[in-house]
Amino acid sequence: MNIFVTDPSPTVSAQVLPDKHIVKMPLESCQMLAIVCSEKWGHGYGEIHKKDGEPYKTDKGAFRGHPCTVWANESNINAWWLVAHAMALCEEYTHRYGKVHSCENTVLEAGHLIPFTLERPKSFAFAGPDEFKYDTSIDTFTAYKRYISSKPWVAFNYLRDPSRPVSYTHLTLPTRIR
């Protein structure tokens, strides 16, 4: 569970992610949005539904305490950024794989339920290793870029669209991480 916020723009943030994240992050976004929309744990906007028509189960509130879910649930501003990012992830999935992601309609449904705002988030949550989380010399965007680039598979995980790898996949990591 995470929102890999590599840029203030939800679209740019999605476009630079490796294939692995493009495939799995729309589902994680939908799980967070289901909590945001739920009556019990969120704002009571209504249920959002999976591709098969079944509503996401939110009665136990799974993931409600995750830093990214807490962040998304703090305001409509944050929730709308997540909707825009999830939609951008789905569009990127279509761009790379030539088909529609199974979560796309769920993201659209959440977008219809959550009250719209044009405002942008003032801050973002970081859910990652301590060596990035507590580095006060970097912002959240850089922390996520370093976290992603620390994975040995990342540089080779842009097979669907080789034009998408970005310069941060070649960052020199601090010695304590290497």
Where are these regions (language model features)?
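An N-terminal structural lobe/cap that precedes and organizes the functional/catalytic core
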Residues: 1-93
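Short, compositionally biased segments
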Residues: 166-168
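Single conserved hydrophobic/aromatic residue that forms the stacking wall/gate
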Residues: 170-178
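Charge-dense polyanion-binding interfaces
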Residues: 80-114
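C-terminal accessory extensions appended to soluble enzyme cores
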Residues: 149, 159-161
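An amphipathic alpha-helical core segment
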Residues: 103-147, 153
